[in-house]
Amino acid sequence: MIPWLDDAHGPAFPPTSRAARHPNGLLAAGGALTPDWLLAAYRRGIFPWFSDGEPILWWSPDPRMVVFPDELRVTRSLRKTLRKHHFEVRLDHDFAAVIRACAEPREPGGGTWITPAIQAAYVRMHELGYAHSVETWIDGELAGGLYGMAIGRAFYGESMFSRRTDASKIAFAHLVRFLLQLDFRLLDCQMTTRHLESLGGREIPRDVFVRMLGELTRDDRPPARWPQDGAQAPWT
């Protein structure tokens, strides 16, 4: 049985070492999606992931997929795309539209874990300066992008979407370059996918990840508004 977290007592998570092996990383249920709960969770390497009709479920998988910003892998074809000038990359231009797009089912009739409760919670974190979006715009339309959380010198990627070829990859590459400029040391990708591996993601043990967060989030920078044109420098 996984522990039930009482939201009346404030955020108090069990150690991530107690997370289940099957399903990988399930740690606890209950709690709340308020800013204090989310900040406490992310600082400990924990994130919410659940479907409509389920209680809030908290996860911390082992191993953990991460990207170190200086290890971004840009393929020849992606670099060619990045050098074109048919798109515009914006930061925090329309966060709500990005999270809504990420919530759209990938297949007709499919579900989504980005429930209305999740959307409302992260829009609130965006208003507080913790959650950010990176957006690829083509011909005046939102073509792809991603959103995530920034705490200290760690960025936690949540979800991405693409309506045009390579639109999410364009946003991801510009995000990583922007994180390097801000001296971020780690981009958490949560779960392993081939898509992330192709961009330089690699797995590290959960205990190593949690220790790194202890260092990177100790320097808790004030939440910041990212400049909308902060990722628009030409790609070389």
Where would I find each of the regions flagged by the language model?
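N-acyltransferase acceptor-side catalytic subdomain
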Residues: 1-236
